[in-house]
Amino acid sequence: MDKFRWHPEFDFSKVRIRYIDRPKGYSEVSGDDIKEIGHMFIYLYSGAAIPHHRIVEIRYGEEVVWRRP
């Protein structure tokens, strides 16, 4: 995630994170929604916090760069 956030060749707004959102099922946020990437949580500008263990997929544009096995 830090690679996409800080490297000048990447546009962080193209990052999409899919995660388990209880009780809804799955939800997705973009890089523009992310305020801070912490040790155990991703903090959003909305005030929500996504635990890292609930992340199931990370995409950059249309490419899946990480998927939970």
From Swiss-Prot:
Entry similarity comment: Belongs to the UPF0248 family.
Name this protein carries in UniProt: UPF0248 protein AF_0420
Natural source organism: Archaeoglobus fulgidus (strain ATCC 49558 / DSM 4304 / JCM 9628 / NBRC 100126 / VC-16)
